[in-house]
A protein has these predicted regions:
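Catalytic cores of nucleic-acid endonucleases
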Residues: 57-86
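Short beta-strand-loop-alpha-helix junction that forms the active-site gateway
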Residues: 32-61, 175-176
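A conserved beta-strand-loop-helix scaffold within acyl/acetyltransferase catalytic domains
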Residues: 89, 93, 98-206, 210-216, ...
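Short hydrophobic/aromatic beta-strand or adjacent loop that forms the aromatic wall/cage
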Residues: 34, 135-137, 274-279
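Acidic-basic catalytic patches of nuclease active cores, encompassing PD-(D/E)XK
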Residues: 1-25
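Active-site beta-strand termini and strand-to-loop segments that position acidic
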Residues: 36-41, 141-143, 281-283
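Short, high-confidence coil segments that cap the C-terminus of an alpha-helix
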Residues: 72-73, 218-221
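Active-site/acyl-donor-binding loops of N-acyltransferases
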Residues: 224-287
Length: 290
């Protein structure tokens, strides 16, 4: 099959920024009308989804993910519209996955409350999903005295006049009350978390969560991981429990503008994602549960 331009662009970007070997459409991989780029050194495969092809099975991508999970291979379903519309963010995510992003230790950063415009601007520039309303908003700032750990000269120049550089954000919902097992729970949702493009704040989410928990004493925190990109293993590493894989979402996709919106009964050009992994961090005192 001839390669679409966006797949060639992905290959070129990775070749220019890493020394990883790329195995294309390996024998024995699950059947697909799309294209695989496999990186055996990282045990990662990019499932490159061209808009020229379609699938009618809403669970197709979930099934592909399950088959790769059985092989202990991480699969990323990389859609052409996402690559075209949010390329720099995708490139940053890929570099992080391949261990090529700059790292900043969370211990050098400070947690501060941020306002809605600051959060929204950061998410538009650094998160693949759209910004959403959030009641509680936090940022991780790297103080000027630690700018020496930044290697990117352009970032250094752009922020040299600042007292601190915003390197990550997290947003949370307000509390909702639920009754489970005859106990009342104050539950919050971690809505968004993002690092600044090109950087990974090591321990950043943990530090933001700690501040949030100290300030609000939640009984539990719920969050979701986009199954197109992740199985959410990193959430489990910091204390979240895997609850379920949600059904795929159905979108209406505009092939010209590379934009999506949730589908309705009149949608003709339907596409499906892989759903989301739901996680829960249980914080209520065990004694209170008994």
């Amino acid at each position: 099959m001839s390669l679409q331009k966006f797949i060639i662009d992905i290959k070129n970007f990775i070749a220019q920024n890493t020394d990883l070997v790329i195995d294309e459409n390996p024998v024995g991989f699950p059947d697909t009308p799309f294209y695989y780029l496999f990186f055996p050194e990282k045990n990662v495969v990019l499932h490159c989804i061209s808009l020229e092809n379609t699938v009618d099975d809403a669970t197709f991508f979930q099934k592909i993910s399950q088959l790769f999970a059985q092989k202990d291979i991480r699969v990323i379903h990389l859609w052409e519209d996402i690559w075209q519309s949010k390329r720099s963010i995708v490139e940053s995510r890929l570099m992080s996955i391949f261990g090529k992003s700059e790292t900043i230790p969370a211990r050098l950063t400070q947690v501060q409350r941020i306002d809605k415009p600051t959060l929204d601007k950061f998410l538009v520039n650094n998160h693949l999903q759209s910004k959403v309303n959030a009641k509680l908003k936090y940022g991780l700032f790297l103080p000027n005295r630690y700018f020496r750990v930044i290697q990117n000269e352009k970032i250094l120049q752009e922020n040299a006049h600042k007292d601190a550089f915003l390197v990550a954000v997290a947003s949370f919902s307000n509390a909702k009350k639920f009754i489970r097992d005859e106990q009342e729970y104050r539950s919050y949702e971690l809505i968004r978390f993002a690092n600044y493009q090109g950087f990974t704040v090591v321990g950043g989410l943990n530090k933001l969560l700690k501040m949030f928990i100290d300030e609000h004493a939640p009984d539990d925190i719920m969050t979701y991981a986009d199954a197109d990109w992740s199985d959410g293993t990193n959430y489990e590493k910091i204390g979240f429990e895997r609850i379920e894989l949600t059904p795929p979402l159905t979108f209406e996709l505009d092939n010209e503008t590379f934009t999506r919106k949730l589908a309705d009964e009149n949608t003709k050009n339907k596409v499906f994602n892989s759903g989301n992994w739901k996680f829960l961090m249980k914080l209520k005192d065990d004694a209170a549960r008994d």
